């Protein structure tokens, strides 16, 4: 057997060994499987000054921390009495590099997923809308949406119309009249209640009078047979005499209540009549104001019409006439130029045809030219005057028809230049005379158009034309319409004059 000191010494050694192993096995820092709290600090210590870059790096950092925490939750939930040998301090340096290596790899992956989700979210609505536009469900949904909007609008239409009418009444001053109408309705209800109360007070007063008269009648009957009273008659007499005072007080109270009810009814009737009179007065004032506004509006419209009439007669009508005259002059000048070019073409065309005629025709033309040259001057003058008269009197078509007839006589030979000169000398004055005659006719037609008169002259001419002796033809319908319009205008003017002159 061992001694007690030896046993105590062994027990102390075993306890010391246990305490040493527990102190050596338990680490002072977090286990390797715990969350790496220094990774965020390393990223935050980056020397980037850009705030946007730091902000973009934060979500990935937080996601990595949350992942590490989710991974470490099962390890943290293990029992505290785990085997100390499994968690040695030599394993912590290996686990920390692994955890530190997970953060840089997780950040790009998170950024890629976020960007992919954003692209899908952006591309999804457009594709869905393009696909759904042709579907019956999409059309039905649109129809139901539009029908709901239409029903809401129709439901709000009545309220909107009511609000618009209320605003119009506020502007015209009819809202106060509506308030008076409501006050009159309240006064009528009050008068009705007061009259009902008066009727009830009358009934109660009549009942009190009947009750007191009945008790007095019975008392008088008992007094008439006073010598033959029985004990019951004596008790009845004392009871009636005692109730007589009560009946008298009740009669007085009912009389006062009746007088108060009648007074209240009279006050309600007076207030009602006063409200009715004030409403009638306000309605008269409102109707006068509306009538006056309508009168001024009518006068304003008439003034606008007169102003527009004056503007058109003074400014627009002369401008329109000048424009028409100018346009007509331009058209006439254009027609004259066109006629001039046509005449020039028709005169040059026979000369070209003369150059291509036969020798026999050229000989005949030479003979005719010799004859024309051998004529005396007086005959030449007569022929010139006749030709000018014919050219001015005839049209362009006649000139073109007569020129081919005279062209054979005007074709000279190559060896006779004198007849050619005389033919050209006779054709040019004819062409000039035709052009001058046409110009004179156009000028005479333009001279017939009177110049546009001024505003004062036009008014003077119109006024003189109204009272002139010019004879016109008019139908019975037009005459009847003019008479009716004149009568209506006279009645309207007289009504306006009477409304303005009428004493207020």
Swiss-Prot record:
Residues 317-480 are mitochondrial intermembrane. Keywords: Coiled coil, Membrane, Mitochondrion, Mitochondrion inner membrane, Transit peptide, Transmembrane, Transmembrane helix. Residues 502-504 are mitochondrial matrix. It comes from the Eukaryota. One of its GO terms (cellular component) is mitochondrial inner membrane. It is a multi-pass membrane protein. This is Sensitive to high expression protein 9 homolog, mitochondrial. It comes from Aspergillus clavatus (strain ATCC 1007 / CBS 513.65 / DSM 816 / NCTC 3887 / NRRL 1 / QM 1276 / 107). The lineage of its organism: Eukaryota, Fungi, Dikarya, Ascomycota, Pezizomycotina.
């Amino acid at each position: 057997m061992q001694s007690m000191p030896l046993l105590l010494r062994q027990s102390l050694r075993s306890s010391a060994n246990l305490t040493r192993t527990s102190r050596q096995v338990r680490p002072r820092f977090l286990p390797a499987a715990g969350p790496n709290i220094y990774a965020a600090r390393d990223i935050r210590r980056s020397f980037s000054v850009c705030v946007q870059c730091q902000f973009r790096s934060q979500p990935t950092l937080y996601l990595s921390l949350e992942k590490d925490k989710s991974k470490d939750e099962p390890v943290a939930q293990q029992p505290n009495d785990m085997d100390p040998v499994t968690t040695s301090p030599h394993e912590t340096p290996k686990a920390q590099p692994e955890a530190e290596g997970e953060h840089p790899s997780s950040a790009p992956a998170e950024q890629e997923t976020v960007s992919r989700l954003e692209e899908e979210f952006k591309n999804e609505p457009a594709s869905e809308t393009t696909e759904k536009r042709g579907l019956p469900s999409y059309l039905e949904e649109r129809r139901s949406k539009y029908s709901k909007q239409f029903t809401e609008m129709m439901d709000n239409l009545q309220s909107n119309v009511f609000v618009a009418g209320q605003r119009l009444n506020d502007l015209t001053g009819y809202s106060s009249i509506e308030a008076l109408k409501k006050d009159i309705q309240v006064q009528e209800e009050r008068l009705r209640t007061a009259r009902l109360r008066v009727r009830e007070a009358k009934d109660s007063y009549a009942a009190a009078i009947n009750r007191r008269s009945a008790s007095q009648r019975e008392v008088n009957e008992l007094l008439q047979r006073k010598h033959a009273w029985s004990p019951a008659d004596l008790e009845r007499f004392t009871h009636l005499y005692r109730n007589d005072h009560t009946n008298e007080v009740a009669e007085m109270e009912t009389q006062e209540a009746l007088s108060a009810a009648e007074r209240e009814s009279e006050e309600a009737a007076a207030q009602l009549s006063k409200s009715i009179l004030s409403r009638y007065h306000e309605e008269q004032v409102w109707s006068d104001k509306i009538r006056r506004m309508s009168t001024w509006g009518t006068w304003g419209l008439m003034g606008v019409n007169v102003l527009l009439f004056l503007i058109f007669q003074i400014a627009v009508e002369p401008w329109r006439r000048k424009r028409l005259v100018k346009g007509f002059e331009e058209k006439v000048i254009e027609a004259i130029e066109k006629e001039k070019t046509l005449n020039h073409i028709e005169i040059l065309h026979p000369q070209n045809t003369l150059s291509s005629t036969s020798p026999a025709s050229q000989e005949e033309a030479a003979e005719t030219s010799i004859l024309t040259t051998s004529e005396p001057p007086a005959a030449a003058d007569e022929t010139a005057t006749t030709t000018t008269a014919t050219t001015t009197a005839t049209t362009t078509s006649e000139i073109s028809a007569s020129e081919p007839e005279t062209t054979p006589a005007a074709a000279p030979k190559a060896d006779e230049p004198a007849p050619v000169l005389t033919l050209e000398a006779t054709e040019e004055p004819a062409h000039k005379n035709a052009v001058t005659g046409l110009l004179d006719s156009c000028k005479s037609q333009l001279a017939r158009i009177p110049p546009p008169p001024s505003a004062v002259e036009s008014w003077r001419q119109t006024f003189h034309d109204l009272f002139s002796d010019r004879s016109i033809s008019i139908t019975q319908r037009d005459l009847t319409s003019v008479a009716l319009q004149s009568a209506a205008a006279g009645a309207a003017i007289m009504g306006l004059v009477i409304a303005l002159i009428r004493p207020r």
